[in-house]
A protein has these predicted regions:
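Short, solvent-exposed loop/edge segments of extracellular or virion-exposed proteins
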Residues: 127-144, 169-172
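Surface-exposed interfaces of beta-sheet-rich extracellular modules
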Residues: 91, 149-176
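Extracellular/surface recognition and adhesion modules
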Residues: 45, 85, 130, 136-138, ...
């Protein structure tokens, strides 16, 4: 299991509002796919077009409710630009894309409400490498899989060969595997 990280030290997380003609309001609740809330005191969230920052979210206290993020996205096109999200660890500076989540910019539009924010799920993906040595096959090919994905690996030796174990020393076959946060090579 290998973890892929998308990060760029060159990301600029500021926007000059006078550089843009149009804006859009977003009210967001950002969580990890497993249900854990993103700690807004530890992370920034921003909207991007390519590598250009188009808005940085601020924490919006909601009376009697859970805080959400308010983000004012900006554009010079009235509509149609596809914007993506990134989040940044305030302590380490590490930046990651929020993969497979985007929105179409529309001037004066709103996405979500303070009382019902738009849900943004951070799904962490890992490159899962499954290979064979000698003669045989494995029923799963691996690939880029979401954290928490369950696999049931079955090693099938070719005629004249036998299964001796996985590269981590386990001899369980079939072998259940849940894609986690630690690197594992099988």
């Amino acid at each position: 299991l290998f973890h892929s990280v998308t990060a760029s030290a060159a990301d600029t997380w500021s926007v000059n509002p006078s550089d843009y003609r149009y804006d859009m309001s977003l009210y967001l609740n950002v969580t990890f796919a497993a249900g854990e809330e993103l700690d807004y005191t530890q992370y920034d969230v921003a909207a991007f077009v390519g590598d250009e920052c188009r808005g940085v979210a601020e924490v919006l206290p909601v009376p009697g409710g859970k805080d959400c993020l308010y983000l004012r996205a900006r554009s010079n096109r009235e509509s149609g630009e596809t914007m993506t999200f990134r989040y940044r660890n305030k302590t380490t500076g590490e930046v990651k894309d929020i993969e497979n989540v985007n929105f179409a910019f529309a001037s004066n539009a709103r996405l979500g409400y303070p009382s019902s924010p738009y849900e943004v799920k951070i799904v962490i993906y890992h490159d899962v490498i499954i290979s064979t040595e000698g003669g045989g096959s494995v029923n799963e090919s691996g690939g880029r899989l979401a954290e928490g994905t369950s696999l049931n690996l079955i090693a099938t030796p070719d005629e004249g060969h036998y299964f001796s174990g996985w590269s981590d020393g386990s001899t369980e076959n079939p072998r259940p595997l849940v894609v986690g946060t630690e690197d594992v090579a099988l």
